[in-house]
Amino acid sequence: MASSIWKGLVGIGLFALAHAAFSAAQHRSYMRLTEKEDETLPIDIVLQTLLAFIVACYGIVHIAGEFKDMDATSELRNKTFDTLRNHPSFYVFNHRGRVMFQPPESEDCHRIQAPFSSNSSLKLSKLESMHR
């Protein structure tokens, strides 16, 4: 219930800001027509703009909820050292280490092996006999 009151207050503030902007634009066009371009805005438009801005900001602050502490220790108390700098979205598994750290036997097989090569089948049979 309270949230809808603050949302209504923000809506009223934004509507009042839009009305003040429209009034300022209308006043400016009137000043152009009367050739009095050096005059400032009337005080009622200025006050409406300031009051609407304050009302909208006040409603937004109450909708946003509780503020967090500026000191990060209150948020870091419930985290362990392992999860502190752990960012799983930055893990990369497709890198050159897969090729660099292969056993030498399997590395040769992958380099030399061709689809219809009799030489590659000979090497494979030699490797299989070595592993038995």
From Swiss-Prot:
Main location: endoplasmic reticulum
Subcellular location per the Swiss-Prot or TrEMBL entry: Endoplasmic reticulum membrane; Golgi apparatus membrane; Early endosome membrane
One GO molecular-function entry: magnesium ion transmembrane transporter activity
Superkingdom of the organism of origin: Eukaryota
Transmembrane segments: 4-22, 44-63
Disulfide pattern: none
GO terms of biological process kind: magnesium ion transport; protein insertion into ER membrane by stop-transfer membrane-anchor sequence; tail-anchored membrane protein insertion into ER membrane
UniProt topology in membrane: Multi-pass membrane protein
Cited InterPro entries: MMgT (IPR018937)
One GO cellular component term: endoplasmic reticulum membrane
Coiled-coil residue spans: none
Residue spans, topological domain Lumenal: 23-43
Ranges per topology, Cytoplasmic: 1-3, 64-132
Keywords: Endoplasmic reticulum, Endosome, Golgi apparatus, Magnesium, Membrane, Transmembrane, Transmembrane helix, Transport
Keyword Transmembrane tagged: yes
Protein's job: Part of the endoplasmic reticulum membrane protein complex (EMC) that enables the energy-independent insertion into endoplasmic reticulum membranes of newly synthesized membrane proteins. Preferentially accommodates proteins with transmembrane domains that are weakly hydrophobic or contain destabilizing features such as charged and aromatic residues. Involved in the cotranslational insertion of multi-pass membrane proteins in which stop-transfer membrane-anchor sequences become ER membrane spanning helices.
Subunit structure as annotated in this protein's UniProt entry: Component of the ER membrane protein complex (EMC).
Family named by the database record: Belongs to the membrane magnesium transporter (TC 1.A.67) family.
Protein name: ER membrane protein complex subunit 5
Native source species: Xenopus tropicalis (Western clawed frog)
Organism classification: Eukaryota, Metazoa, Chordata, Craniata, Vertebrata
